Amino acid sequence: MPLSLGAEMWGPEAWLRLLFLASFTGQYSAGELETSDVVTVVLGQDAKLPCFYRGDPDEQVGQVAWARVDPNEGIRELALLHSKYGLHVNPAYEDRVEQPPPPRDPLDGSVLLRNAVQADEGEYECRVSTFPAGSFQARMRLRVLVPPLPSLNPGPPLEEGQGLTLAASCTAEGSPAPSVTWDTEVKGTQSSRSFTHPRSAAVTSEFHLVPSRSMNGQPLTCVVSHPGLLQDRRITHTLQVAFLAEASVRGLEDQNLWQVGREGATLKCLSEGQPPPKYNWTRLDGPLPSGVRVKGDTLGFPPLTTEHSGVYVCHVSNELSSRDSQVTVEVLDPEDPGKQVDLVSASVIIVGVIAALLFCLLVVVVVLMSRYHRRKAQQMTQKYEEELTLTRENSIRRLHSHHSDPRSQPEESVGLRAEGHPDSLKDNSSCSVMSEEPEGRSYSTLTTVREIETQTELLSPGSGRTEEDDDQDEGIKQAMNHFVQENGTLRAKPTGNGIYINGRGHLV
């Protein structure tokens, strides 16, 4: 009766403490506990704390006591698993600690910690009491991962022409600290900074760029990596760069189509911008003609008349800037010859210009060719004169050699020494010239040249020259003025003052 009374007086917590203290007594044996050094769980998931005793087959596990080891508070009871009385849990962990679902091994002392939170991180101890081996204990660390929840914040409005500007920033906080990067084809720079908290760390990454219209509409993606995530988290931001392109007008590519009576003529204003631009059409020299319709960027005309001629202005604007583009429309009247395009005249002018260019080119070619041939002729003439001079000098030397040797003088030359009868010689030469045939003159001249060449070869090159020889050379030079060289022979120049000596045709 007193034992039962005492049992009634003790509450469940007292029995838990008693059993937990009893689990720390025993003796050492050869069995071992199978546990993990670190148990990792994601925030909100269930954490399994493993503790399995592996010993002899005849050994029995009496109880398994779980406690949390706190550096500040010491050992704090968590739960007690008894082979006979079942599981007893500390009221602080009521409904959070339980056994794994069946089937369960009697040697398995593992427990489940439901809905793990960051406060559950820490060191846990498992102590197993066996019979007859005694008690065994092991410690493990519970790590709770806190996945980050990234957020992306766009920077200030981007405008074309700005310098380096913040495009967006991405922040992620978790435990441990997450990794934040950027995925984009846009050229820019990124920088990161981190902040540490008691149970987590926050990382913020910023992306800077120089805005341009090519970046408008491009994706900028923040990528967050963390061990608590099954895959990277991505947040995409579409860049919006404010710009306004230059304006232009299309529709006047062929001015000849703008004639009186044409229907469906339009002018279209072309431009791009962010935000999308607005269009406005005006006429520079007055209001828009009646019947002209404005529909956004397009200006539509009724059947054309000469009144539609004028200067039209397209005005493009958005919140950033404005642009203008103007064109001149001239509506042609086919019945007015003054305004028709004279294609024939234009063709004639073009042909005339081409012909003039070709003529100028031909003149240049002719002048260049004439100068070239003139220069070549001068060179040939100069060369010919040099050769002729050399030939004359050789002939003079041969004649001199022929007359200086008295043994080589023919008998027919005796008549030349009769200095007292010049008149008779002159008369005879005149008669002889009139009576001789051309063939005789050619033969006699060739004979004389051959005789001179033969006698020149017989002379000694080392013979000295006297003053008398020089006088004779001068006379021979004067006599050679009456000869002409043709085809390697000397021919007498046709003159009435020539002296014919003998019948062999020697002219002096």
From Swiss-Prot:
Subunit and partners: Self-associates. Interacts via its Ig-like V-type domain with NECTIN1 Ig-like V-type domain. Interacts via its C-terminus with AFDN. Interacts with TIGIT.
Q: Which residues lie on this side of the membrane: Cytoplasmic?
A: 369-508
* Tissue note: Expressed in brain, lung, testis and embryo.
What exactly does this protein do?
Seems to be involved in cell adhesion through trans-homophilic and -heterophilic interactions, the latter including specifically interactions with NECTIN1. Plays a role in the senescence-associated cell size enlargement via SFK/PI3K/Rac1 and thus promotes senescent cell survival. Also participates in the innate immune response by acting as a ligand for the receptor TIGIT to inhibit NK-cell activity.
Q: Which GO terms describe its cellular component?
A: adherens junction; plasma membrane
Q: Which InterPro entries match?
A: CD80_C2-set, Ig-like_dom, Ig-like_dom_sf, Ig-like_fold, Ig_sub, Ig_sub2, Ig_V-set, IgC1_2_Nectin-3-4-like
Which CDD domains does this UniProt record tie to the protein?
Answer: Ig, IgC1_2_Nectin-3-4_like
Sequence ranges of Basic and acidic residues compositional bias: 398-410
Gene Ontology terms for molecular function: identical protein binding; receptor ligand activity
Name this polypeptide is given: Nectin-4
Q: Which family does it belong to?
A: Belongs to the nectin family.
Transmembrane region positions?
348-368
- Please give the residues the UniProt entry marks as glycosylated: N280
List locations, semicolon-separated: Cell membrane; Cell junction, Adherens junction
Q: Which residues are the signal sequence here?
A: 1-30
